Each structure stands twice: as structure tokens, then as C-alpha cells.
Amino acid sequence: MSALTDLTIAEARDGLRAKRFSARELTDAHLGAIEALNPRLNAYITVTPDQARAQAAAADRVLASGEAGALTGIPVASKDMFCSEGIRTTAGSRILENFVPPYESAVTERMLRDGAVILGKANLDEFAMGSANLTSAYGPVENPWKRHDDDAVLVPGGSSGGSAAAVAAHLALGATGTDTGGSIRQPASYCGIAGIKPTYGRCSRWGIVAYASSLDQAGPFARTVRDNAILLRSMAGHDPRDSTSAMREVPDFEAACQRGVKGLRIGLPREYVADGMSEEIRTLWQNGAAMLRAAGAEVVDVSLPHTKHALASYYIIAPAEASSNLARYDGVRFGHRSSDNRDLNDLYERSRAEGFGAEVKRRIMVGTYVLSAGYYDAYYLKAQKVRALIARDFAEAFRSVDALLTPTAPSAAFAQGETIDDPVAMYLNDVFTVPINLAGLPAMSIPAGLSTTGLPLGLQIIGRAFDEETVFAVSAALEQAAAFTHRPALRADTLNAGA
């Protein structure tokens, strides 16, 4: 479609400031790519061309004044969990199909303040509940990658699959996502891009549709580690409207990408050698460790003994919090309202039955069950105790290492329909990412190799709380060593070639 859609954020920033192209030209190139590819990929639920062009025009005026912000003129996508003032925000659910927020989320507010151009709202699993972007009420998202040996439609990962697919297919230079149990890192791995879940509290949750409040955290997607650093610096910062938002200065994450890893100790958790781990995932992990050694890091084994209990604990805690958070959708105050109701209780029941999809209903039922009087101690309280042990394991490991290296996901992207009928199999996709959310730590996925069928595979770098700088340093070094230059078959810059 245009060479402009092939730029990184850093390149686009430099080009805009050097006046090699305008923000309007950059925005129009991406809107053209969306118009051509989104009908197939379904990466966006809502595209906002008029708003984007107005923001681009404002960016050009700022650029002409010589006072550009960190993201002035940079076109990005916003996951449809972030409230957008005056723009429909659905959370991927029918129950919010006509919800138009009267305010902007704190994260996108910061990005707009820094001059970002928001192209539209990216598709996602309903209420961020899913690992494949198959539960959206607005249809599944197609991964722009293809296997070498067939033309199957692949999942982009979830829940932030639309954000990841949009960035991978060059329909945006970057995107926002949320990560509750792996919803940034796993789609990044499946789509061959980079994405970071910051420390819990690094970014404000104000204005993000809530799933599990003690686990949800906003973060960026981009095609490079450096671009993620640029985005996160804009997104992060204390917000008095969110009581969990940390009162900490936001470091220069972009500068941290240049630090290197010489002298750092990198841990490999023994417990991440999961039963049934494929040989290609094991080899990818070993190769990543070897790359870091070659770059000057010391690589050692560490133990996280309670890791094996993380998935079970997560799928008690997250549904419990979801059951509470989603109780607000009753058909009265906002969202879908059923018609022809007999009484108030019937209104509640019908509105929720019609508005929520099957996976959301499943998690609400599980959450309500574990919070019930007879099972609270047996399930929810026990899961919270295990969560504390998992956090303690990480704290102990970080007494002897600076970062941890693991696979991001147990496999490459799979085809739509392969595991959707087995919710337990779908939940197992989060086995390597969930422990980090339970501990509230920062972690990043970067593309580090290809599967035997030509699909991207990611490695995950985990850091201490509020030490995203080391995560970026290790990720950038690994990115340079891996030299991942493969790109998906379906992307904006191949459209004229008939891809």
C-alpha cells in the first residue's frame, strides 16, 4: 500500500520531525491499508477516519511549530477495552454494542496529549476473556501469518488479538492492549511482534473496562522493542483517579534499550520445562539463553516451585473478580436492555442472557461459585494464599538474578476451531504468562524464531517490579541477536503485490 506503513514508530517520529512526510500522509496511508485489509482480518471493530484525520491535522500544526510531543502524528490502534470519549466502546460484547463513553481512559488521554493519532478501536475477546480472539461478539480476528503447508485461518492470540494483528499487518504503527493473564504477550508471540505487560500499577486502569481488577494492566504493542519503549513512556504515570496507580517517576525506557546485558544474571526457571513441551519451543528457549550468554550475560537455573499451581489459582481469582465487576451490567444503567420483560428480575436475567457470550457466562458462573459461602475458603481464599506463595517465589529468584527468560507460549498460533470446544485446552495457552500477572511483575514477549511450519515463536523476559528498564535492556539485546526479520503474508505493504 505504502512505504509509510512499513515504518517503525522511531522512524516515523524522525521522518515527521524532518518533514519528509506529513502526519496526514502517514495517517491516510494507514487508513487506506485498514480499508483494504480489515474486511478480511477484522482487526478493528470501529474505525474512526474523521477523528484520525482531525488529529493528524492538529499534529501537523504542532510539528510546524517545532514543539512535537513524544507521539505527535503517530497512528495507533486502541484496544476496545479503553474508553474513548464520544466513540463507541464495546469490550467486544453485545451488552455494550451501543455504549458511548462520556470520558477518555487515562492511558489514551496521555497518548492523545502526546500527539498520537488514534485510528480506531481494535477487536478483542469479549471482556478480554479468551486466548484466541474467538469470543468477540463482532467476529473473530484473523492472524496475518500463514503456515507454509496450508492456508488455514490462524488465531492471533487473545485477548488483545485485534491490536496484535493490526500492528503485525501494518494497519497501525503501535497499539494499546491489556494483559490480565497473558493478553498482550501471547498475541505478540502469535503475531510475530513485541509487546510488554508493565508492572501492576505502572499504567492507570481508569477508563479501562474492568475484567479482573487485581490483575488487569495496560501495555503497548509494536514491531520493535524500542517502539514499545516509546509507547510505554507515554502511557505510564501516576493517576489519582486510580488508587492502584503507582506514585513513581516514569523512566526513559527508550534509553534503557541501549544498555546491553553485559554483567547481568539471567535465570531460567526449571519449572517452566512443562510436561509435553515441544522440541521446537525447548530449542527456541535454549537458543535464547545462548544468545544472551554471547551478549555478555550469565545464565543460571532458578526455581519457582509454586508455578505448577498458577493456572489453577488464576482461573479461580480472575473469574471471581469478573463475577463482581460484571454485576454492573444489568440492563438498567447502561448497555444492552432486553425488551418485553415481566418485571425487574426478568429484565436483569434477559439483558444479561442476551448480552453476554458463552465464555463470559462460563467465567461469571465459576466466579460466583468460588465466592459462594460454602466454597469461599476452599477455593478463593486458598487461591489467594497460593498467589502469595507465587509472588514470594519470584522475589526469592530475583535475589540472585536480574531477569528471567522463558518461552511466551507453549506453541505457535493454531487454526480457528482447533481447540475452541475444549475450554481447558484454551486456558493452557496461558501457562507461561499467568504466573507473572499473579505476582504483578513486568514481562515482555519478543519474536525470536519460527516454528517448523513458518510461524513466529516468542520468548518472554520477566523483570523485578518496576524494573521495566532491565526488561527493555534484555529484550533489546535478544532482539538484536535473534535478528527476526520475517513478516506475515497479509500486510499493508504487500497489497499492491496482490498478497
Swiss-Prot record:
GO terms for cellular component: glutamyl-tRNA(Gln) amidotransferase complex. Transmembrane segments: none annotated. Keywords: ATP-binding, Ligase, Nucleotide-binding, Protein biosynthesis. Its EC number is 6.3.5.7. SUPFAM superfamilies: Amidase signature (AS) enzymes. It comes from the Bacteria. It is an enzyme of class 6 (ligase). InterPro entries: Amidase, Amidase_CS, Amidase_dom, AS_sf, GatA. The keyword ATP-binding applies. The active site is at residues 79, 159, 183. The keyword Cell cycle does not apply. It catalyses: L-glutamyl-tRNA(Gln) + L-glutamine + ATP + H2O = L-glutaminyl-tRNA(Gln) + L-glutamate + ADP + phosphate + H(+). GO terms for biological process: translation. GO terms for molecular function: ATP binding; glutaminyl-tRNA synthase (glutamine-hydrolyzing) activity. Heterotrimer of A, B and C subunits. Belongs to the amidase family. GatA subfamily. PANTHER family: GLUTAMYL-TRNA(GLN) AMIDOTRANSFERASE SUBUNIT A, TRANSAMIDASE. Allows the formation of correctly charged Gln-tRNA(Gln) through the transamidation of misacylated Glu-tRNA(Gln) in organisms which lack glutaminyl-tRNA synthetase. The reaction takes place in the presence of glutamine and ATP through an activated gamma-phospho-Glu-tRNA(Gln). This is Glutamyl-tRNA(Gln) amidotransferase subunit A. It comes from Granulibacter bethesdensis (strain ATCC BAA-1260 / CGDNIH1).
